[in-house]
Amino acid sequence: GMANSVVASVDDVTAGYWNPSGLVKQKEKLQVSFMHSNYFSGLANYDYLGISTLVSENSTLSFSMVRFGVDNIPNTLDLIRNGQINYDRVTSFSAVDYGFFVSYAQKALKNGLSFGGSAKVVHRQAGDFASSWGFGIDMSSRYESQNDWTFAIMARDITTTFNAWNYNFSPEEEEIFLQTNNEIPQNSLELTLPKFIFGVAKK
């Protein structure tokens, strides 16, 4: 967002997502934030919930949850049976990504410097036939100079985030895959490699 300047400028509960080290700028004892947004004329929905609390004068703890999903996707696997088309057999499913973050930020001994990190659990679901669970860690640092410049770095998925996919199809559904020359998905492991984001902002 904003050419990555948000990584440096964020200073409230939403820092748990953008840059955990920015949580130390929170002034209130407790902050709560919620957001809902539609994409592609309502085809996809994004939801965010964040809660953060001061642990001490120098540290902050937060919990964040995000959901991004496409709902009511037609499932046409059973549309044609024995050469007959029957739209009553068309069902619907959702493809949804969930992210759960527990974040902590701490001011360093050096004035203006802070560090933060997030442990995250990622869950993805596509109907009743595909799901995955994964785990990852984000780390960040932020430095605010005396002339109001802020420099920040965010290391996403620094440990390499994994998602273990599990597929569950009935024998009838697998037969449809074979008849239509489609490959039957196999259980697999998806990896997200580390990504470093730099941001600069000025008040």
What role is predicted for each listed range?
Residues G1-K203:
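Subset of outer-membrane beta-barrel
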